[in-house]
């Protein structure tokens, strides 16, 4: 079984999603996980790390160190399900080939539409001549990430004024 398939199968069984898998120099194996309903906390990373350590040992996978992490605020979008889940969010997209001389776009993601396997994704962005819509397929994407939204007031309780 391929390493990514092995890890993804294990994570699905635990109720998590594999966002990204990275093999780095010196035997480092990085696994980025998510849980769509609740997000990720440190206890999730610990639990997954313990389970993957056992699975990788049993499967005789060669690695020196394992890191399990959340995908972060600027989470990558890779699968069609990611583009569906984050429709309405602000994203940064880099296309493989330029469209009208431009490869990098930042805008609001529209839900994918079209026939299965030929879905088109929309991105509403501010063009040179005003609001514009870019349509592209997942295969056109080099990189896509959420634009982090940081709300420093989000942790304040209502009625607790200073």
From Swiss-Prot:
HAMAP family: RimP. It is found in: Cytoplasm. InterPro entries: Ribosome_maturation_RimP (IPR003728), RimP_C (IPR028998), RimP_C_sf (IPR036847), RimP_N (IPR028989), RimP_N_sf (IPR035956). The keyword Metal-binding does not apply. It holds the Pfam family RimP_N. Disulfide bonds: none annotated. Belongs to the RimP family. This is Ribosome maturation factor RimP. Keywords: Cytoplasm, Ribosome biogenesis. The gene is rimP. One of its GO terms (cellular component) is cytosol. GO terms for biological process: ribosomal small subunit assembly; translation. Its main location: cytoplasm. Required for maturation of 30S ribosomal subunits. Coiled coil: none annotated.
């Amino acid at each position: 079984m391929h390493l990514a398939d092995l890890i993804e199968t294990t994570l699905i069984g635990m109720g998590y999603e594999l966002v990204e898998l990275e093999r780095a120099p010196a035997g480092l194996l990085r696994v980025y996980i998510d849980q769509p309903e609740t997000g990720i906390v440190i206890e999730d990373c610990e639990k997954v790390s313990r389970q993957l350590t056992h699975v990788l040992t049993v499967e005789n996978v060669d690695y020196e160190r394992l890191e399990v992490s959340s995908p972060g605020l600027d989470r990558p979008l890779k699968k069609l399900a990611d583009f569906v889940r984050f429709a309405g969010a602000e994203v940064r997209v880099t296309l493989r080939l330029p469209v009208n001389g431009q490869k990098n776009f930042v805008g609001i993601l529209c839900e994918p539409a079209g026939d299965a396997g030929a879905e088109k994704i929309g991105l509403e962005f501010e063009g040179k001549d005003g609001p514009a819509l870019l349509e592209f397929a997942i295969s056109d994407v080099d990189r896509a990430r959420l634009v982090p939204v940081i709300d420093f007031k989000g942790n304040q309780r209502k009625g607790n004024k200073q």
